[in-house]
A protein has these predicted regions:
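Alpha-helical cap/lid subdomain in secreted, periplasmic
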Residues: 1-113, 117-135, 143-148
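Acidic helix/loop microenvironments that form the catalytic cleft of cell-wall polysaccharide enzymes
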Residues: 138
Length: 148
């Protein structure tokens, strides 16, 4: 249940992180690639992302809305092109998946780079202290942009 044990665990992680002298940052989950027959991206996470938002607000923790950012990315790519973000391989196309793979949850190497880029861009946009540890050439590379 996102409103009980999940929320409790998030609050505990924030408390323990602060007690250790670190600064917590909460992120919502990335979306799954699930388009319906009309080409509309469907939510698959229920209330879990909402609870992360609530904990971030209530405990005044920096929050990165990866659900929103990745939803925009999936929509920008659309039902077909978004396969490249995930593990979609035909038999023999990838040595790790000789029999092929059609996985709309896990990311391809390309997708992982895109999602990491979005997270890093948001860290910089929010001017979080963590930005000091990001190489500027990584931010300047702008692997993916959500600008229209």
């Amino acid at each position: 249940n996102p409103f009980t044990q999940y929320r409790y665990n998030l609050e505990r992680y924030v408390k323990e992180t602060r007690e250790a002298g670190a600064t917590p940052i909460l992120m919502s989950s990335i979306v799954r690639r699930k388009f319906n027959e009309h080409g509309t991206l469907e939510d698959t996470h229920g209330n879990y992302p909402l609870v992360v938002r609530m904990v971030a607000r209530d405990l005044e923790v920096p929050f990165i809305d990866m659900q929103y950012l990745t939803e925009r990315l999936e929509r920008k790519f659309g039902p077909e092109k978004s396969e490249s973000i995930h593990l979609h391989f035909e038999p023999g196309e990838n040595p790790y998946y000789q029999n092929g793979k059609h996985d709309d949850t896990h990311l391809s190497y390309t997708g992982a780079k895109m999602i990491a880029s979005l997270a890093l861009q948001e860290i910089a946009r929010q001017d979080l202290a963590l930005e000091n540890y990001i190489k500027h050439q990584v931010l300047e590379a702008e692997i993916v942009t959500l600008k229209d």
